[in-house]
């Protein structure tokens, strides 16, 4: 009996100990995030309020301004917004057709041994950090763009679009290819039985049936193109 009571006390103690430990860990995480948010908002909102080192600043000028020189009190992010939109649109216009055709090739056209090699390679590319894509763009793409660009450094929107296109391709391909493979086999068999060719079946039956997955892949690609700042900074 005494031994059982001792074991029960140990269990209760350990349970309370870990409960308190996990609670402290959760509180630490919440407080850390809250402090980060307060710091970011404090620094970000400082120019819009009087009696600070930056002085007052108009929110409309902040959104529409085309000049970013904090040293002189100019905080316009309009050109950043425009550049982000143009770079994302360019990457989507170039990347989506390539990703769509690549997904069709992996899911429907390529022999199974080849598809089993290409599919993991695409998934591996999707896991590469953005900083590595940025280094690749800086070392490879920027010098290539430099040869056709009027800017001596090679820094241009074209280089950014090229890097973002390469970045979003694996993400879109992985999602779209999975959606294509999820289309029921009966759809394909029915189309072929009606006399359609394989390509007609793919583009008129399979792709429309997988349109929700295709849209999801495009949205994820857009999200990554907009959110990946490190690669753009390096390029």
Predicted regions and their residues:
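Residue-level signal for discrete positions within transmembrane alpha-helices
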Residues: 80, 84, 120-123, 127, ...
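Generic hydrophobic transmembrane alpha-helix motif, especially the helices
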Residues: 123-168
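Transmembrane-helix boundary motif in ABC transporter permease subunits
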Residues: 10, 91-122, 143
């Amino acid at each position: 009996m005494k031994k059982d009571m001792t074991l029960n006390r140990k269990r209760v103690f350990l349970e309370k100990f870990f409960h308190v430990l996990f609670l402290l860990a959760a509180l630490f995480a919440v407080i850390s995030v809250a402090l980060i948010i307060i710091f970011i908002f404090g620094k970000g909102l400082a120019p819009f309020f009087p009696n600070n080192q930056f002085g007052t600043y108009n929110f409309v000028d902040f959104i529409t301004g085309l000049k970013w020189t904090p040293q002189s009190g100019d905080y316009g992010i309009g050109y950043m917004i425009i550049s982000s939109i143009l770079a994302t649109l360019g990457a989507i216009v170039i990347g989506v057709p390539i990703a769509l055709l690549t997904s069709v090739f992996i899911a429907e056209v390529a022999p199974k041994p080849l598809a089993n090699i290409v599919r993991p390679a695409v998934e591996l590319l999707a896991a590469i950090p953005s900083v590595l894509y940025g280094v690749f763009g800086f070392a490879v793409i920027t010098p290539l763009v430099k040869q056709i660009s009027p800017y001596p450094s090679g820094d241009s929107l074209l280089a950014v679009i090229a890097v973002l296109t390469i970045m979003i391709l694996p993400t879109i391909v992985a999602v779209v290819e999975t959606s294509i493979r999820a289309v029921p086999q009966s759809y394909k068999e029915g189309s072929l039985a009606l006399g359609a060719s394989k390509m007609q079946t793919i583009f008129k039956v399979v792709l429309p049936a997988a349109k929700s997955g295709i849209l999801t892949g495009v949205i994820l690609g857009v999200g990554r193109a907009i959110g990946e700042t490190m690669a753009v900074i390096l390029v």
